[in-house]
């Protein structure tokens, strides 16, 4: 089976579509461009499917390279047979390839290699063959006693032969494959306490679970507990289940050497095979857990980045604190800083009243409509002050509301070189307040400035393979930025470098060009940016918006390569570009449907998927896909944990989705947990089948433990 067929079978896709995607990737096209503008070639796969295809393509190509390297190495030893070549070529995983290569690898000095140096290999071969006329092992060994070679006795010779046979059995790919499968089916992971002290790992102090049923979050928690020296972990398998399998593979009944080989096989299992497979199984469990956790992190990150913006509103950002006070920043509707201050609401009643008065003055002065409060230290006290403040100012003509905003990564950003370049005039603390205000206005534009790992919507992210995690999360950020589109005249370098086809250098060049020449007035002008060549332009043009352009198409997701098709479509339906600008296209979908999509697509020279995308963009030039999502919850009053009672029905926002449940912000400074058993009335394997981060959900309070700060919620009982 060739690479394309293998990928198509694995992913359940049409081989022609897979081949087209592979070709597009090999040409250097980006995933966002392929997903958005090459739908006809791949059957409209989404960006997640395309990234999975790309990842598997890299793995299978790596597998093929390893196959060739292994065959070359064995061939150079003069040991490559047709049968071995076929086995290597048909190996489906790297583990299978390595099993086949194992007997031919250069080995470190082992008991078996030392026995071979003593000339005991012929004895091992004679006994392992177990021919009918094979002499008894003790008789056969007498001829190999040689004190000069270090073989003093018959027992020494037999021990050396046994070591050679044991290693040979251990290197047998078929045996390893069978035992690996047995451990996967019937093995158990056992975790015991290494200390009597209480810890967060107490759940795993006396824990046993079958390998097949282990959950990813359990594996990651156990690994961390073991790393910290709190847990002792092992894989167990009933030895009496494994040994018969081994004996059937290597022992020939009736031979005089049968018992000797049986004993060598048991030594191979105990000393070589099982310890090796135990490490392998632990590694495989960790890899699977990492893969699942990274996938879940990416799944959680996407809706967080795609939170609907609260656009065009003057916003006050509050970065709460005790000793250093509460940092304040007021930004206008575009995120430009209008004012900053520091107040001390936690110092006492007098200081709190002074803080309220100072903030009320800022609200009145700048026409603040929303307050964004960071959810870190002193957030509860700051929220209570904000509610008093809102009550006061809303007695007049103001209509101010607030929202608690995650400040994850804000402190990292505020102390970064990027923040220093953006706000050289403000200290670190005030930069955090600006970031918090902007997170409410446009979460995506602000969060792209932060390492995705610092946003905090994953499990055990610091224990995962960082390269793999970075690739997955950066892919999500890139997909989100390109799905939304970027205003080239206002975007920061951080946002621009996430656009398909651009990088750190070209993003800075775009900003420099903008500063030197004024705002871009057309997409075509983007070609003048230094180091932004034709290929980069092809990749990025459709994702960059130019609201100031005379051509309305420059403020849509229609790619310049489809401009002529868009104009032809308008002419076909009796419309003009002026109608697009003036929003006079409400009848366009009906006209195209009446004309026939296939016929229209053929006449304007595009496929039906591209035709539909063009129609969608012409109807809403400058649209933001995030505006179609549920709006964030803005509050004017505060709820506290002591106010919660069992049976209360509340509305909250999903903050995190993990293997065992969903954390929901219900506005009390302590996220409640909806256990997986309370997420849905139907059976689900994972909460992500039902909810995503950022979803607004109804929940029922089941139980509140103020002392432990735990809130148990149910979604299924709220339905």
Predicted feature residues:
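Single-stranded RNA-binding regions, centering on S1/OB-family and related RNA-binding modules
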Residues: 546-550, 554-719
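A glycine-rich phosphate-binding loop feature that marks nucleotide/adenosyl-phosphate handling sites
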Residues: 181-188, 318-322, 376-378, 404-412, ...
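Duplex nucleic acid-engaging cores and interfaces of nucleic-acid transaction enzymes
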Residues: 33, 49-52, 59, 63-317, ...
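Structured, non-catalytic alpha/beta "coupling" segments that mediate domain-domain communication
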Residues: 73, 87, 98-101, 225-238, ...
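Short, ordered loop/turn segments at secondary-structure junctions
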Residues: 37-39, 128, 238, 320, ...
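Generic start-of-chain signal for non-secretory N-termini
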Residues: 1-19, 26
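Long, highly charged, low-complexity intrinsically disordered interaction regions
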Residues: 55, 61-79, 89, 412, ...
